[in-house]
Amino acid sequence: MAVGKNKRLSKGKKGLKKKAVDPFARKEWFDIKAPSTFENRNVGKTLINKSTGLKNAADGLKGRVFEVCLADLQGSEDHSYRKVKLRVDEVQGKNLLTNFHGLDFTSDKLRSLVRKWQSLVEANVTVKTADDYVLRVFAIAFTKRQANQVKKTTYAQSSKLREVRKKMIEIMQREVSNVTLAQLTSKLIPEVIGREIEKSTQSILPLQNIHIRKVKLLKQPKFDLGSLLALHGEGSTEEKGKKVSSGFKDVVLETV
């Protein structure tokens, strides 16, 4: 048997080992600032590669979307089941000025609402705000037992559900089309639209657990720096925003 060099064996590296480079040495951190609509404006931090040559770090940050729990923005665990999307529209030094980009429910909250013996009502509508943002708004509601009801189930007739759905769409169109995006955000936090739907549909069907479960941004107008700076307040350095008051007391809803 011929004795020779086994080519399959790995060769030894010549010279010294390469020095390990810290990947974070080429990156820089930026502070994310929420609009003054929310009570806590310091969302967190994000990083990006430093500006080099013709490549500007600010260009890579604009349009970046962050998903934040509303409980962190409002400082209250009552909003822990809702998630807010914030989009970076402008970079000022080390601060990223964001704007509202959408709203959603956590999946565990949605699953906890669906129960036996009741009817589910869902409605959605595409509507334009007063400042030309095109949104698709989704609402959800459930039937509940009437006072002194003996029957176990609370299923509703299809005709009644259609009436309720029509009323929900009317209210969502009215409440969204007459306000700006910032004013709409102030309505969504205390769930004003859900309470308005509950009040208006009492004559048709008694409802419970009425929520605007999702808001999706479809189209936005041409970027206006002045309106964004006004949304963040002068200088955009304040850590606290304006507290949104619901004007309502929590009502314990009747369960099935």
From Swiss-Prot:
It is found in: Cytoplasm. InterPro entries: Ribosomal_eS1, Ribosomal_eS1_CS, Ribosomal_eS1_euk. SMART domains: Ribosomal_S3Ae. One of its GO terms (molecular function) is structural constituent of ribosome. Its main location: cytoplasm. PANTHER family: 40S RIBOSOMAL PROTEIN S3A. Belongs to the eukaryotic ribosomal protein eS1 family. This is Small ribosomal subunit protein eS1A. It comes from Clavispora lusitaniae (strain ATCC 42720). The gene is RPS1A.
